[in-house]
């Protein structure tokens, strides 16, 4: 069990809002009929993709962030290795656990790990730079509230977890909706570090672009090899070679940079749970 000081807010969303369907009607390639600039006009329920003021991703930098050394929320992780499946959804590769792979606990509420997936290049920018890849760890409570943790990667040494499942990725690379067992996977193998992280209110990065999702983005950047990036990219179907939404305007939102260590105590800051605004 690992205990981290953290403040996170959540939004109740339907499972369809996680872009879990493979019958997608949006693309990423600029100039296409369904590229990100046109998402808001494809469906009425996607209008907020163009009109929303709290859209994601954004550029994260200390210059726009409020530094926080302590918060009033405690996040505890209780992960365990269980059998998992890798699925090619066409627009990304998703890891889904067949049984209970554990949870995070915040404010005495359990949030079960639902799935993990990758975007390449990264969706969030760090100090003005779009990195090579971004991992999303999605957790959900029984009430439907989400807690999403994003981990950024730059090109460099191979990522240990992706190396472990490379042969499985190859196996379903050309199979739409293809699934393959990847054995027992411990979520801790993804290797994220919560000693320093950004948080802000944003949205889903895919339609319907629902707002008031609180993003927690790890400041420590991992590495992934060029070969691994190419394998994941090549596995996606046309229009999804780069499955990253462009950066969205900040529109005056507060961004917090939580640093776990401080030479002197700082006032504790409570971030209210997301609600109607």
From Swiss-Prot:
Residues of the Alpha-carbonic anhydrase domain: 24-259
Taxonomy, superkingdom: Eukaryota
PANTHER family in UniProt: ALPHA CARBONIC ANHYDRASE 3, CARBONIC ANHYDRASE
Function: Reversible hydration of carbon dioxide.
Tissue expression pattern: Expressed in flowers and siliques.
Chain positions covered by the region annotation Disordered: 257-277
Glycosylation sites: 70, 107
PTM statement from Swiss-Prot or TrEMBL: N-glycosylated.
Induction notes from the record: Accumulates in low CO(2) conditions.
Protein name per UniProt: Alpha carbonic anhydrase 3
Similarity comment: family membership: Belongs to the alpha-class carbonic anhydrase family.
Cysteine disulfide links: 49-209
Organism: Arabidopsis thaliana (Mouse-ear cress)
Annotated signal sequence range: 1-19
């Amino acid at each position: 069990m690992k205990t981290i000081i953290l403040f996170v807010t959540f939004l109740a969303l339907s499972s369809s809002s996680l872009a879990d369907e493979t019958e997608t009607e949006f693309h990423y390639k600029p100039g296409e009929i369904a590229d990100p600039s046109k998402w808001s006009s494809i469906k009425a329920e996607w209008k907020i993709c163009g009109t929303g003021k709290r859209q994601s991703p954004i550029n994260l930098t200390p210059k726009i962030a409020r530094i926080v050394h302590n918060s009033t929320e405690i996040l505890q992780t209780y992960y365990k290795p269980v059998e998992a499946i890798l699925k090619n959804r066409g627009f990304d590769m998703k890891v889904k656990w067949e049984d209970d792979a554990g949870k995070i606990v915040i404010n005495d509420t359990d949030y079960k790990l639902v799935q993990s997936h990758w975007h390449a290049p990264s969706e969030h920018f760090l100090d003005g730079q779009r990195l090579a890849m971004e991992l999303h760890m999605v957790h959900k409570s029984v009430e439907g509230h989400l807690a999403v943790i994003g981990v950024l990667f730059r090109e460099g040494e191979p990522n240990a977890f992706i190396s472990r499942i490379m042969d499985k990725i190859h196996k379903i690379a050309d199979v739409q909706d293809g699934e393959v067992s990847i054995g027992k996977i411990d979520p801790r193998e993804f290797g994220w570090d919560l000693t320093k992280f950004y948080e802000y209110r944003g949205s889903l990065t895919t339609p319907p672009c629902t707002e008031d999702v609180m993003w927690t983005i790890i400041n420590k950047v991992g590495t992934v090899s060029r070969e691994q990036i190419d394998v994941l990219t090549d596995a996606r179907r046309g229009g999804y070679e780069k499955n990253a939404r462009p950066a969205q305007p900040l529109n005056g939102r507060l961004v917090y940079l939580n640093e776990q260590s401080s030479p002197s105590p700082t006032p504790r800051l409570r971030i209210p749970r997301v609600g109607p605004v």
